[in-house]
Amino acid sequence: MAGTTVDDVIDGVPLVLRSYYDSFKRHGVEIPMSTLNEMRGRDKREVINMLGGEKAPAIYRDFVSMLEENLTKVKEISGASEVFRWLKKHDVRIAVESGFPALVTRDIVKHLHWLENGLIDYWTCSEIVEEERPSPAMIRRAMRHLHIRDPSEVVKVDDTTIGIEEGHNSKSLTIAVLTGTQRREKLEAAKPDAVLNSIRELPGWLEEMHLA
C-alpha cells in the first residue's frame, strides 16, 4: 500500500522509514536510512527482529506506536480513488495488501474510507497470512477471498522489488510504479511486466494490453 496506493510521506520522509529510524535510535541502535529503505515492502516485525536483536520487542512496540500516532497524516497516492472507480466500472476486483501490522493496515484503510466507499473489495497483510514477501501468500489469500482461481488474471502493482518478486512467485502479471522510494533501475532489475510512473497510468496500460 505505502508507496503504491498510499502516500505516507510526512515532512519529506516516508512515515514507515521515519518510524523505523526513530524507534531504533530510541533504543540505541543506529541503522542508516539507506538500509531501511532496502527493507521497504517487507514485514515490519521481521525487519525489526532481524536488525534489532534482543531489543527488537521494545523497538517494535515503539515502531507501532509511532505509526498509529501519525496515521491521520497519510493520504492516498494522487489519483488512486479514480483508478479504483475505473477498475470497478470495468468489473475488476480490487485487493490491497501491506507489510504493516494488521491493526495499522486496517486503520489506514478505514482512514481512507476505501472499504466503506466501495473502492476496494478486500485488504490483507503479512501479519494475517503469517508469511512475508516475496511469499505469494497475501496474493493467494486475496484470490481465495475474491474467488479468482487463475493467477494470470491477477495484476500485482507494487513500488518495491520484493513486491514484484511476490507477484512473480504467484504467477501474476507484475507492474512496478515509481511513486515509492526505490529507483527505476532497481525496480527494472526485478523484471516486472511494466514500469509506470504511478498507479494513475494503470487504466491506460490495461487498455493498451487489451486487459480491460
Model-derived features with residue positions:
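Active-site neighborhood of HAD-like aspartate-dependent phosphohydrolases
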Residues: 1-36
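Conserved SAM-binding loop
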Residues: 5, 76, 94-97, 131, ...
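Substrate-recognition/cap helix-loop segment adjacent to the acidic, metal-dependent catalytic center
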Residues: 25, 47-50, 81, 85-95, ...
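Short acidic capping loops at alpha-helix termini that bridge into adjacent secondary structure
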Residues: 31-35, 116-122, 150-154
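Metal-dependent phosphoesterase signature
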Residues: 46-85, 90
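Structural recognition of alpha->loop->beta junctions
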Residues: 112-125, 186-206
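Conserved Lys-Pro-Asp/Glu-containing loop-to-beta segment of HAD-superfamily phosphomonoesterases
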Residues: 133-164
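Acidic, Mg2+-coordinating phosphoryl-transfer loop and its flanking beta/alpha structural elements
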Residues: 155-194
